[in-house]
Amino acid sequence: MPLVPLEHLDEVREELVKARKSRHRRLLVITGDDDSRLVTTALDFIYNVKDLLSGEKVLYTYHAFYSDGAMRKELFEKGVPRELSVDYVSYHKLDEVLGRTYAAAVADLVNNLEPNDLGRVMGVVEGGGLYIFLLPSFTRLLETVTRFQSNLIVPGYTDKDLKRYFEKRFIKKVMEHQGVAVYDADNRYWVKKFGKTPSTPYARPKPVLPQKSKIPVKVFNLALTQDQVEVLKIFEHFYAKAEKEKLVFVLTADRGRGKSSAVGLGVGWLAHRLRRAKGKCKVVVTAPAVTNVQEVFRFSAAVLDLFKHKVEVLEDESGMITKLLSKGIEIEYVTPLDVLKAKGDLLVVDEAASIPVPLLFKMLKRFNKVVYSSTIHGYEGAGRGFSLRFLKRLKNEEGVKLYEYEMSEPIRYAPEDPIEKWTFDLLLLDAEPCEITEDDLSLVSAGEVYYDAPNEEELFLKNEEELRQFFGIYIMAHYRNNPNDLGIMMDAPHHFLRMVRLKNGKIVVSLELASEGNLGEDLSKESAKGAWLMGNIIPDRLIKHYKILDFGNLRGIRVVRIATHPSVMGKGLGSFALSRLEEEARRNGYDWVGAGFGVTYELLKFWLKNGYIPVHMSPEKNPVSGEYTVIVVKPLSEKAKRIVDVIAKEFKQKLLGSLASPYFDLEPEVALLLLKSTPSFEVKVNLTKLQLARFLTYAWSDMTLENCIDVVGIMTRLYFLSKKKPSLSELQELLLVSKILQAKSWHLTCQELNLSLAEATSNMKQIAQIFSKEFLGVNSEEEALRYFFLRMDDLNEGVSA
C-alpha cells in the first residue's frame, strides 16, 4: 500500500505522460523531516511511473560522507523496482556521469544544497524525464547549515551570520516556475502543483544531409540535429592543408546542445582521413579539466569504430578517458599549459572561454588548425563575453581563415524546456548586462555616475532585473564563473556587494568584496605555522610568508571580483569604483584594501595605477590560466603603511632572487613592472677586488658576459634595489630581467625581446659601462686599466661605494 494517496500519484503520472509527448522534463521537489517518509514517498512516485522508465537508466545522487545520506540511499536501493537500472553516484563523483543520459534522476539534497551540484545534475535527464529532489521541510532548510555553508563560516562569524539568500531564492524559484511541483511528504499534500505546461507533441526535425561531401553518410547519420550536421560540414574544410593561412573554427552553444559530441564526430572523421592521406595523425585535445572532453573522446572513438580502426582507450585513475590510440592515430588530452609544448595536426580547445585569451593566442601560434568551442549559457558558461574578448581580436589577426557557428537546438530535450528555464533562472546562467545606449555613453563621459551599496535582500530576492545586470557583468567579463560563485555571494557572511551606476540607474561596474583580518594573536600564530585560515586570503598569505603577526590584527577589504561593463571599459569607471571603496573603507576604520588575481601586464598596470603595491606572488602557475597569482595591497592606516612597506621591500628582494626559479617563465614585462612598483632603498656596492676586476674587464675590454655573470647579477640586483640609480631604457631593463635575473639563454632572450644577438650583446655591454660609471665611478677603459693588472697586495680590501 503506497504512502502517497493514489490521486497524487496519478497527477505525477499524467504530467509525465504529457511531458513525454512534448519531450520536456518535469521537477518534483519532495520535502520532509522524516527520512523514511521522504524516501518512501519518492519510491511511491517512481513505482507509479516505472513502466514509463523501464529499459532506461535512473540516476540517484547523494552525499556519501554523511551517514544519514548513506542511510537514505540504502533505503532507496532496497525499495526501488527491480526492473529499473539505477546508477548510484556520490556528488563528488558526479563529473564521471555528466556525459550520460537518464530517464530520471533522484537528487538527495538534504545535507547540502550546493549551487554547483544543481548546475551539474540538471543536464543529465532527457526530454520526457523526471527529476526528484529530496529536501528537508523549507522551514528546516532555512535553519540547517549545509556542507557548502559550513565552508563560508570564517573566523569571526557564526552560523547565525549566514545570509541564506540562496536557499530563499531556491524556494522562491521553485514556487514560481511551471513544470515544477512541491510535495510535502510528512503531511502528504501538494504545496504547489506543476501548473500549466505545454502538451504539444514534439518530433525532432530530421537533419538534412549535404548532397556532396568528403564525409560519408554513415558519419552524418550519427548527428542528431541539423546543428551537428552543420558542424561536421565545417570540419570538412580542415582536411585541406593550412599553407597560406591558419584554419580556425569557433563553435559556441548553450549547454546541452551536443557541442562536444559534434566536435568528437568531426575529430574522429578528420583523424581517419588524415591517417589515410599521410600515414599518421595526431590530435591534441585540451580543456580546463579532462572531464570537459569526455564526449569528444567518446564520439571520436565511435567514428573510428565505424571505419574499422582498432581503438585502444586509455583512462586515468578516476576512469576519465585521456587518450585514444589506433594504428597511425593518436588523440590525446593535455592540460592548457602543456599545449604550448605539444605538437599535432589539429588542436581542439573545449570550454575555451575558461582559458585566458593570451593563452588561447599562444596556442594558435603553435598549431595551424585549431577548433575552439565554448558554452555560452549553462554550468560552464561564459556568456557572450568570450565572443567579445576573443573573436574581436581573432578577426583582426592576419593569416587566419575563420569559421564560426552557434548551435541552438537542444539534444536531450525539446526547445523551451521548463526545467532548463528554471535552472537558468535560479542560477542566473543566462544573465547578461544591461544594454548601453548613446545616451548612456554621454552620462559616462559627463561623469554622471555614482557608487552604490545595494540592499542585498532586495537585490537577490526582489530586483531580478538589477541582479541579472549585476551578475551578467561578471559572466561577460571574467574567464570562469560557476554557480558556487553566486552561492558564496548570496550566503557568505563576510562577503558584500557594491556597484557603480549611471545616473539613470543602470549598473556599469560590479564589485564583490570580503572583509578580512582582525584575526587576533592565536589565529595569526596558527597561520604563521602553516594552518590555512578560511576566508582570510590576504592576511593568511602575508602572515604565512612574512611571519609579521601584526598584520593579522589589521582589518581589511579584499576585492574578490571587480568587473566593468564591456561597453564602457577604459573610461575610468573601475578606478572610480576603487576610489569610492577606499573612501568608504577609511570611514569604517579599515586598515587596507587589497586583491589577488592572475597576473597579466594589463591587469597589473590597472592596480598599480590605482596605488596598490605588490606584496606576494604564488610560486606555481594556475594550471588552467597559466598565470601566477599576485596579491596587491593599498594601506589606508599608518600602521598598515609601515607593515606593507616592510613586506613590499622583502617581496622585491625575494623576487630578485627567484626569477631564475620558480619564475623563469614569468613574462619579463610583468617581472619588470613588479620590480619597479615595489619600494627601493639605500644599498651599497660591495664587491671584492677580483669581482670588480672581472666586471670592469667585461665593461671596458673583451671579457665575455659568461665569465662574469655572477658579478653582473650583483650589479643588476643593486640597480633594481637602489633608490639612486642610473637611467636605463625599458629595453635594457627587460634585457637585465630576461638574461641576468631569469638566466635565460641568449637565444630565448632575443626571441622574447625581439632582438638580434648583436643588438642584445651590444646593449648588455652598454649597461655594464653605465653601471661602471654610476655605481663604481669608473668612466672609461683608461680608468679601468688599473684593475686589469692586480697584485696580491691589492686584494686586501673589497670595494664599497
Curated annotation (Swiss-Prot):
GO terms for molecular function: 18S rRNA cytidine N-acetyltransferase activity; ATP binding; tRNA binding; tRNA N4-acetyltransferase activity. Residues 457-637 form the N-acetyltransferase domain. It catalyses: cytidine(34) in elongator tRNA(Met) + acetyl-CoA + ATP + H2O = N(4)-acetylcytidine(34) in elongator tRNA(Met) + ADP + phosphate + CoA + H(+). It is an enzyme of class 2 (transferase). Acetyl-CoA binds at residues 562-564, 569-575, 602. ATP binds at residues 228, 256-265, 412. PANTHER family: N-ACETYLTRANSFERASE 10, RNA CYTIDINE ACETYLTRANSFERASE. This is tRNA(Met) cytidine acetyltransferase TmcA. It comes from Thermofilum pendens (strain DSM 2475 / Hrk 5). The lineage of its organism: Archaea, Thermoproteota, Thermoprotei, Thermofilales, Thermofilaceae.
